[in-house]
Amino acid sequence: MTENITKLKKQLLNNHILDISIGLVYLWFGGLKYFPELSPAEDLAKNTITSLTFGMIPDNISIILLAIWETLIGVLLLLNIYRRQVIIIALIHMVFTFTPLFLFSEQSFNNSYFYLTLLGQYIIKNIIIIGGLLTLYKLSVTKRRLL
């Protein structure tokens, strides 16, 4: 009995490490956005949301909504609650994180589309998060089929 419990704990922990790491990133980045001028991505986020919503959402509201969105994703991933739904919401968010590459390409690239600015690198690194989220989604679908 104890051996089975140990195996189960190990399996749960191994599958949850990716949830925890992505959840912490979301919680951290989202948490910074609650405090004006603390997040290095604040201006980019405001400008992107303004462009995507055609200015219909004021900057001070949009950044708080984004902070809520990101911290909620982070908390739910950390707690492993509504896992599949949260992963889908996070993937949608990740798609939108790439829009500045097109909306503000002059800020994302230097001289060439292969030479990224620091801002461009900040955006491109989200590919890693997308890979992790897709892995988690695949695991959740596989787990659901087994049940």
Task: Describe each PLM feature range.
Residues M1-L72, L76-L147:
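Membrane-interface extramembranous regions
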